[in-house]
């Protein structure tokens, strides 16, 4: 009987929360509209906030009185007076919150200002709910819990009603999960269209892949199907299918990414909830939703968002497997890792060590059975992850595109070299920075993610993206692991080994990777950090003395890492630092000493609120500017735009043509700067040199137009070709008038804007920036013979071989000897177009190129 009563109260509370949320969502929407209109009408934020709340107060009161608390029979006057007091308290809370948000965000305008107002309004809504339940409608709530009043009309049906024969069982979503998903939806979708094509490199590939199933299957960057993208195709397949369904538009590409971000938040919530409870799950999901780089990547089209989702899903399936020991869950975990491999190759394996160790340690059905189950999961991973590489291997080279990022056209070179060990040991070539559309830089951090070492994740390039609360995750995760004593019977052990293992493996690899490392890579850390923080919160609320110690130490650890990040971000949140120190230390002491669960929970929530202020502010500020370019970053515009500059598609490598012939000086168009020289237009500056137009500045130098700025520098103006593509457009008109055909240029990035704009048949034969791939003369001869390519544009700053590679020099020498040079006057009399480069017509020159390829 008692159990039935408790269950009834739980169902009633769930219905109450659900009803309140529906009414609150409608009132919040009305509030947002009113607030926006009043702000545009010239009112101050405080006045607009007060009037908007007043206008929606009556409707909110009436609806909650009738539907949520079923208190229509109670005295109206007393309830209305109490609600008015609750409203005034909510107004005070929202006004203070709005003032803090406006100060933290630097008094923004436009969409960011509206979002700050809505956030303050939501805070007031939470306060009003608590007051309504505990005071305004207290008698109705007590009567409902005592079983004397019928349930509210808007509450979900009882379990018994849902299970009636002949009806479908309905599981209502948990209110806290709905809140998390709504928050993630706002952060991921708000003003999404301002990001345009985001990374034009991938958007161009999506257009090419959406027009041809051959291009789709073989991951082709260009419409002609000559060169692949330098990443596997899974994330681009999702975007290309969306484009096929809804048309080629920025939102067709970006909305799937935003939905992936929401799904990851939901997965983290459930991953933590299954082991540490709903409050812990909510904290984990909230931390992820408010992580700046997680917000930025959910609003961008780089493949990392799908990678993060799939790796999180692998951990979720592992957690399910640890619960009941079933083989199917561990097989599904292997499938998720395999799909992640098809998204970004070897980096997907970061989660594997933790999963393997957790499964072998816990071994729900014995060690021998665990080994067999791991073999099944590993087979699934290899089968799924190896499917596309096997396809590329078995397809004859002449029937598929050249594999970008390689010099031997081998998918295995891409896997283990450019996208694999080369990123760890520093042997992989690649671009240092690129401009973003609309003059935005590629993202804070520029060439690298800072010096390698244990402090890398807290530096000025990476710390603000995901390093704020690393101390909570580190200390909390370690503390729970010690408390569990790694007992196989303790359900926390396997969970912590899997999740903590994924976190440690990724953090160590990212901290010491010597290769090209960009700030947005740390988005893979975000769900692991969030899950460990959620677990720490749930553990600290358990009431055990060791749990209180872990909670207190975790708060201090979080304070330390956040202060370290703030130290590396001068000028950011100066007002927060003393408040953070005092508040967190007091909170840690109270959590350690308090025995009352409610007191401990309230203080822990307040301390977490302090720790989340800075990252949440950065997450919200990400919505105030375009997240575009090659290297996205979260945070204010001054940080996110702090990388190399560029116009639409601009890239420091120059205009997209090939480098000049052997022997050309660095001052000539298309030449290579000598090792000790200074880069001129199209050249590459040495480590101690300085870059001019189209060059690359050293990591410690300052970039000029198109150069690469240091991590905290401001971007320049971008390379000349990428600015509007007008030079290539003029050449394309000439090509179209003389038989058409594909134009071969150096940089895929430089060709991206033209492909996006018109689907122009232009192929970047040098890879992403023009210096990652070395197509052979023999391959070029075969493409010319088959009619797949006819024209070659040799231009300044083409960049095929920063160090003057033999392959690129030999290729251009062969083109010069075998193909016919087209006078620049033939396609334009303008000096701007004339300097676009030298166009070569290779029609009928396949035999000559073949002869030269054997020399």
Name each region found by the language model.
Residues 71-90:
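Juxtamembrane helix-capping/reentrant segments at transmembrane boundaries
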Residues 366-379, 544-551, 573-581, 593-609:
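Membrane-interfacial entry segments at the cytosolic side of transmembrane helices
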Residues 717-752, 758-803:
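Luminal/periplasmic acceptor-recognition loop/helix of membrane-associated glycosyltransferases
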Residues 153-428, 439-548, 557, 621, ...:
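Membrane-integral, polyisoprenol-dependent glycosyltransferases
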Residues 199-215, 223, 352-483, 561-569, ...:
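Transmembrane-lumen/periplasm boundary regions of multi-pass, lipid-linked membrane glycan transferases
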Residues 133, 329, 333-334, 339-340, ...:
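Membrane-embedded alpha-helical segments of integral membrane proteins
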Residues 15, 43-55, 108-123, 172-176, ...:
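Membrane-interface starts of transmembrane alpha-helices
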Residues 27-31, 35, 56, 60, ...:
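Alpha-helical transmembrane segments of multipass membrane proteins
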């Amino acid at each position: 009987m008692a159990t039935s009563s408790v269950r009834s109260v739980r169902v009633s509370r769930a219905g109450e929360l659900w009803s309140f949320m529906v009414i609150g969502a409608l009132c919040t929407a009305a509030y947002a509209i009113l607030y926006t209109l009043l702000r545009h009408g010239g009112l101050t934020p405080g006045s607009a906030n007060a009037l908007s709340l007043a206008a929606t107060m009556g409707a909110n009161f009436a609806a909650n009185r009738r539907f949520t608390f079923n208190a229509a029979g109670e005295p109206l006057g007393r309830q209305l007076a109490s609600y008015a007091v609750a409203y005034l308290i909510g107004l005070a809370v929202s006004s203070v919150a709005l003032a803090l948000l406006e100060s933290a965000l630097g008094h923004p305008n436009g969409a960011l200002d509206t979002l700050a107002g809505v956030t303050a309004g939501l805070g007031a809504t939470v306060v009003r709910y608590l007051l309504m339940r505990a005071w305004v409608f207290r008698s109705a709530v007590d009567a409902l819990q005592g079983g004397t009043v019928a349930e509210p009309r808007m509450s979900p049906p009882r379990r018994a009603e849902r299970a009636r024969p002949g009806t479908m069982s309905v599981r209502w979503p948990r209110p806290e999960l709905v809140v998390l998903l709504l928050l993630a939806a706002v952060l991921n979708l708000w003003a999404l269209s301002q990001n345009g094509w985001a990374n034009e490199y991938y958007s161009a590939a999506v257009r090419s892949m959406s027009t041809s199933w051959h291009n789709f299957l073989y991951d082709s960057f260009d419409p002609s199907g000559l060169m692949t993208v330098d990443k596997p195709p899974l994330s681009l397949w999702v975007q290309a299918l969306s484009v096929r369904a809804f048309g080629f538009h920025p939102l067709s590409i970006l909305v799937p990414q935003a939905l992936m971000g929401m799904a990851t938040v939901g997965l983290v919530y459930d991953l933590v909830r299954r082991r540490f409870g709903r409050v812990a799950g909510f904290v984990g999901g909230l931390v992820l939703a408010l992580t700046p780089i997680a917000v930025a990547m959910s609003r961008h089209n780089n493949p990392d968002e799908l990678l993060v989702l799939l790796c999180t899903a692998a951990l979720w399936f592992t957690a399910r497997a640890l619960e009941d020991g079933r083989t199917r869950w561990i097989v599904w975990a292997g499938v998720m890792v395999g799909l992640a491999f098809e998204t970004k190759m070897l980096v997907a394996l970061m989660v594997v060590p933790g999963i393997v160790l957790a499964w072998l340690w816990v071994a729900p059905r014995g060690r021998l059975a665990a080994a067999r189950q791991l073999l099944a999961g590993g087979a699934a991973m290899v089968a799924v992850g190896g499917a596309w590489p096997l396809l590329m291997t078995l397809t004859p080279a002449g029937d598929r595109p050249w594999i970008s990022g390689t010099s031997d056209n081998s998918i295995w070179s891409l896997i283990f070299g450019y996208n694999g060990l080369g990123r760890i040991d520093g042997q992989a070539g690649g671009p240092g920075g690129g401009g973003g559309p609309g003059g935005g830089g590629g993202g804070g951090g520029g060439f690298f993610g800072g010096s390698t070492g244990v402090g890398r994740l807290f530096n000025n390039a990476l710390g603000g993206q995901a390093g704020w609360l690393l101390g909570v995750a580190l200390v909390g995760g370690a503390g729970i692991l010690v408390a569990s004593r790694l007992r196989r019977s303790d359900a926390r052990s396997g969970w912590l080994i899997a999740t903590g293992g994924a976190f440690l493996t990724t953090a160590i690899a990212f901290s010491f990777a010597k290769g090209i490392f960009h700030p947005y890579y740390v988005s893979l850390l975000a769900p692991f950090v969030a899950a460990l923080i959620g677990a720490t919160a749930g553990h600290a609320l358990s009431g055990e003395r060791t749990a209180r110690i872990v909670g207190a130490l975790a708060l201090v650890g979080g304070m330390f890492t956040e202060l370290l990040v703030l130290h590396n971000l001068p000028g950011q949140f100066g007002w927060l630092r003393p408040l953070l120190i005092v508040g967190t230390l007091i909170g840690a002491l109270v959590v350690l000493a308090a025995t009352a669960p409610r007191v401990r929970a309230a203080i822990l929530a307040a301390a977490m609120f302090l720790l989340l202020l800075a990252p949440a502010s950065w997450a919200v500020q990400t919505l105030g500017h375009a997240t575009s370019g090659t290297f996205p970053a979260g945070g204010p515009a001054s940080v996110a735009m702090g990388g190399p500059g560029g116009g639409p598609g601009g890239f420091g490598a120059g205009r997209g043509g090939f480098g000049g012939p052997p022997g050309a000086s660095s001052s000539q168009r298309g030449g290579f700067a000598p090792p000790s020289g200074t880069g001129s237009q199209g050249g590459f500056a040495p480590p101690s040199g300085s870059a001019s137009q189209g060059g690359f500045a050293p990591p410690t130098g300052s970039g000029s137009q198109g150069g690469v700025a240091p991590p905290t520098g401001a971007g320049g103006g971008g390379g000349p070709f990428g600015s509007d593509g007008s030079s290539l457009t003029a050449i394309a008109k000439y090509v179209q008038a003389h038989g058409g055909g594909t134009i071969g240029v150096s940089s895929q990035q430089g060709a991206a804007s033209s492909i996006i704009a018109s689907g122009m048949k232009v192929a970047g034969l040098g890879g992403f920036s023009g210096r990652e791939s070395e197509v052979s003369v023999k391959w070029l001869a075969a493409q010319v013979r088959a009619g797949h390519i006819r024209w070659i544009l040799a231009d300044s700053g083409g960049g095929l071989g920063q160090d003057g590679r033999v392959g690129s020099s030999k290729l251009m020498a062969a083109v010069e000897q075998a193909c016919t040079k087209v006078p620049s006057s033939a396609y334009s009399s303008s000096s701007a177009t004339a300097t676009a480069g030298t166009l070569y017509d290779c029609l009928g020159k396949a035999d000559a190129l073949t002869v030269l390829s054997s020399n």
